[in-house]
Each structure stands twice: as C-alpha cells, then as structure tokens.
Amino acid sequence: MAGAWLTRLLVVGLVLAALNLRPAITSLGALLEEVRDGLHMSGSVAGVLTSVPPFCFALFGFAAPRLARRFGPGAVVCAGMVAITAGLLIRPFAGGTVGFLAASAVALMGIAVSNVLMPVIVKRYFPDRVGTMTGLYSMALALGTAVAAAVTVPMTEALGGSWRTGLGVWAVLAVLGVLPWLGLVRERGAAAPTSPSSSSSPSPGIPAPASGLRLGRSRTAWGLACFFGLQATGAYITMGWMPQIFRDAGISAGTAGLLLAVTMVMGVPLAFVIPRTAARMKNQGPIVIALGLCGLSAYAGLYFAPAEGAWAWAVLLGISNCSFPLALTMIGMRSRTGAGVVRLSAFAQSTGYLISIPGPLLVGVLYQHTGGSGLPIALMATFLLPQMVAGVVAGRDRTIEDEARMRD
C-alpha cells in the first residue's frame, strides 16, 4: 500500500515539477517589452536575457548526475523547485538589470537540474512506461508553458498593471511544486518507490555511472545533442521573441500573448501523443521530418504575412515545438540501462543547451540593427534544416551501448 501511495505521489510530483519548468521563461516573453522599458534594456541586452536559459541549463545540467548520485534525484529535484520559487520571488524586485539576470539564473538553475533528471526518474521508476510517462510530464510542461503565456498579460493588468507583480505571481505555482518532493525525500532512498529495475543499483537514489561509454565518440549521442540544441534554440527564440514579432506586425500585446499561448498549448495533447507514438517506432526519423516541415511552413508565414495568418502560424509553430518531447523520448530509448540514460540525458541536454546559446543572442543583435523581424525569422528557419538532419541521425534504431560494442 505504501509503495502504491508513493508511486502516486511521484506521478503528482513529476506533473507539478513539469508545470514549473517554463513559466519563468514564457511569462517574461509575454512582458518583454515592459521589462525592457522598466530596466532600460537595449535589444542586445534583451538578446542576452533570452540566452540566459540555455546557458544555465548547459552549465547546471552537467552537474545534475553528480548531484543526484550524491543526494538522490528526488532531493535534487526538490532543491530545484525551491530554487525556482526563490528566483521567481526575487527577480521582479531585484533592482536593475544585473539583479534581474542573477535572480533569473537562480530559477533557471532549478529548472536545469530538473530538466536533466526527469528522463532519468522516468526510466528508473517506470521502465516499461517510458513513452506514457514522458508524454505525461511533457504534456504538463506544455500546459505550464501555455498557461503562463496566455494569462501573464491579463493577470498583470488585473493586478494593477505592474510587470513586477505579473512575473512574481508565478512563484505561487512553484511553491506547490515543492510540496510532493518534500514528502518523497523524507522516504528512505530520498527518491521514490522501488521498482523491479532499481534493485540492482548500487545507489539508493540513482545508478552509478555507466562504464565504458564514451559519448563523445557516439554518433547517436551527438545526433541527440545537436537535435536537442537546435530545437531548444527555436523554442527559446519563440518564447522570448514571438510576442514581439506579432506586436511589431500591429497585433496588440494581449493578442500576441494569446498567440504564444496557442503555440504552447499545441504541445499539451501532442506532447502526450508523440512520445507514445515514437516509443512504438523503431526509427523516429519520419516524425522528425514532419515536425520540421511544420516549422518551416510557420516561419514562411511569419515572414510573408505575420498578421494575416497569425493563428495558423501559431498552430504550426506549436506542432514544430513538439520536437522537445520527441527528444526526451529518444533519450530514454537510445540507452539500454538507467545508468546509460543518466549520462546520455546529461550529455544531450547540457551539450544541446550550449549549442542553443548563440541563437537568441543573434536574434537580439539582428533585431536591434535591422529594426525588424525579417532576418531573425529567416535565421530561425535556417536552424531547422540541420535540426532535421541531426534528428534523423538520433532517431535510428540503435543504442549508445550498441555503438560502444561496434567500436570495440
């Protein structure tokens, strides 16, 4: 009975954690113009601001496996939720640009370690339901992203019109995300219920490092890292700049936020369907291509008719952004062991986020120097081409252990 209760608590914890992994970013995107005015930011500095998420995800993502082995994944995710809460509370009232960036980094540190450990926890405690559980928390992640994009502007207006209040209120959701993990870390093993696959692990919290795996020599690992990095580039540019692109086309701030919400809410059903579908396929390349073509169509529409077809472009971008749950699913499928997934998740996500850092910076610079969205949109479309190539490589029916044996 206790084991069943802990399993349910773990599912609740995964869902609430996932709900908190994007509001810190999408709420800022909805109010970016107001934040820029309030903090006197240039376009280039705003580009730096939208590059902070992937930088923090890369930096702290590399540390996640070591922290999880030391303290247990549940304790690390719990600490991550606390960091998100603290960062969201402090950020709006931190003073100038430097304080705003520092508080954002605290929240993003918590998001980073949780990002890496989600596939690990799913593989460890739900080894026979990787697609289903990945879909569940990906759906929750998309829901949190969409809700933050949709309600931040109207909620800010309802609370008095201050962007500081509109950003800070998301700390309430983060507090809720802490609660189930506090219960989980109090249990022996500081993680969650046991599973058949976990009894052979030398650590109560997480498998020991997989020996003999040189991910730097694995085409699959690099394919996943590049695919993850390029889809993250598009996602963070979308979350940071899409409302501004629509506002430049003459669309109101509230409607621009709703358009971003439509993009994000597309991930709610698709983030559940795509992982389940991908888990049943030996090769995920066709899904990669289909999502990429949706993205290219959306960028073409944004370039030639941003206002006239705004809702259609938002829907197509939302479909394209489901490359994220697909990447998480492939991480869980491209290793035979929990220990391998730990290393592959950290490598693919941290390396991927490093790859994604220049994208938002380039968009900010191009936006400032051209005064329009044309070149940034063209750049975003260009990124999709290597993303599709990398995704096809990552989607092949092989594991990192298979590649290691072939090299030996």
Which residues fall in each region the model found?
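Juxtamembrane intracellular "pre-TM" segments in multi-pass secondary transporters
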Residues: 1-4, 186-224, 408
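Extracytoplasmic gate region of multi-pass secondary transporters
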Residues: 28-29, 219-262, 267-269
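Helix-breaking motifs and short loop linkers at transmembrane-helix boundaries and internal kinks
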Residues: 40, 72, 93-98, 127, ...
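Conserved MFS/SLC helix-loop-helix module at the cytosolic interface between two early adjacent transmembrane helices
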Residues: 59-98
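Cytoplasmic helix-loop-helix junction between adjacent transmembrane helices
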Residues: 103-141
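Helix-loop-helix hairpin linking two adjacent transmembrane segments in secondary transporters
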Residues: 128-129, 136-189
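C-terminal transmembrane helical hairpin of 12-TM major facilitator-type secondary transporters
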Residues: 284-327
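A late C-terminal transmembrane helix in Major Facilitator Superfamily
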Residues: 335-373, 380
